[in-house]
Amino acid sequence: MPMGSLQPLATLYLLGMLVASCLGRLSWYDPDFQARLTRSNSKCQGQLEVYLKDGWHMVCSQSWGRSSKQWEDPSQASKVCQRLNCGVPLSLGPFLVTYTPQSSIICYGQLGSFSNCSHSRNDMCHSLGLTCLEPQKTTPPTTRPPPTTTPEPTAPPRLQLVAQSGGQHCAGVVEFYSGSLGGTISYEAQDKTQDLENFLCNNLQCGSFLKHLPETEAGRAQDPGEPREHQPLPIQWKIQNSSCTSLEHCFRKIKPQKSGRVLALLCSGFQPKVQSRLVGGSSICEGTVEVRQGAQWAALCDSSSARSSLRWEEVCREQQCGSVNSYRVLDAGDPTSRGLFCPHQKLSQCHELWERNSYCKKVFVTCQDPNPAGLAAGTVASIILALVLLVVLLVVCGPLAYKKLVKKFRQKKQRQWIGPTGMNQNMSFHRNHTATVRSHAENPTASHVDNEYSQPPRNSHLSAYPALEGALHRSSMQPDNSSDSDYDLHGAQRL
């Protein structure tokens, strides 16, 4: 290939490296990729958030051309679980309880690629959820003094829980291995083995014993596609000492059996746990309790085993809220109301939920909100707009209204003038301040013809009051003032 054709290729390669370095973490397979799981009480399950160059972003489940309800093969997110120090991925799909305190993004291209992402509206984004297996808690091995004699080389006794197809971690049939011999353990319902079961769950690093699983028969039919190594072994052991403190003293070997009930336990460390949420309230810390069964959410029905607040305290903690403030049972007036039922006191003890097809009484729980909601942006904008309109209204209409009020007030204080009010009256007078105004009932014909003048007549060389001068002249000729008028004609003076 000529050297001239290599230069454009080298330029494109360098440009691609520059774009990749600007975008930062392009895929969850990159060694420096950062991710976290939020909105749950475990670091190994929750809402997937990734860190790009400008901060943390919630990943929408519609990314990479998927629908908001599509579930993916969880093994594709194994690198994310490894970076979170969790076990294998159990589920990858819509988280359903969407909480978006920060920005959300939709990405395109191959699954797990973040080189082509765009910001999405929070109300259009459904969060992507990931559930990984919880890591096993390791305990330091007990130190024992070295044996005086060299034992026969053999594997130490050990236990294993075999879950049924689609089962849970820390739940299943107990298998015991001693040396080269391994098998299941025979179990009878009348056996008093509470201490033994707690010892077994603790030895399996699965917490404490919760319950026996429903009757499980050894040698059950193999499910299609299930590997043979996941099938329970035949019965080889029987309980010997229910108070044992070491595995080699707990069981004794018996003749192999192909059928019979075997020991199957459910321990408190089972995974995945029941997920809950609060809906229909004013915030994520208030509402009706719903639980998840597979990919579906349904109302949690009230039960007699949950009369205390322990269950609701656990629900509030899962929502990352404070302690429970109150809870009340809603009346199930509809006989067709359906939901899910947990027979245990706490939801963390329920490895399966039962259906209730009628008279499901929902529970409304109110938790303490660590971040109470303030005024919404729309409310603040409305208040500001109303204040602006009020100021504009005062600026435009205020001066005009003020002038009208001042004018009206001044008119009331101005002097009132009385002019001719009848056909035979040709005089106008100043009203005497000492005269008593008669009622309108005595002079109804003049009650509506009073004249008001804003200013008195200006002085001139001509008489401004000829009628008044005539009246004065007549009054001098007729000294008796027998008129019923309210005006003092004797006291009138020429202006």
Swiss-Prot record:
Cross-referenced Gene3D superfamilies: SRCR-like domain (3.10.250.10)
Signal peptide feature range: 1-24
UniProt superkingdom: Eukaryota
The record's account of how the chain is modified after translation: Phosphorylated on serine, threonine and tyrosine residues following TCR stimulation. Phosphorylated by LCK on Tyr-453 and Tyr-487 upon TCR engagement.
Keywords: Cell membrane, Disulfide bond, Glycoprotein, Membrane, Phosphoprotein, Receptor, Repeat, Signal, Transmembrane, Transmembrane helix
Alphabetical list of InterPro entries matching this protein: SRCR (IPR001190), SRCR-like_dom_sf (IPR036772), Tcell_CD5 (IPR003566)
Segments in the Cytoplasmic topological domain: 403-495
Segments of skewed composition (Polar residues): 475-484
Protein's recorded name: T-cell surface glycoprotein CD5
Lineage, uppermost ranks: Eukaryota, Metazoa, Chordata, Craniata, Vertebrata
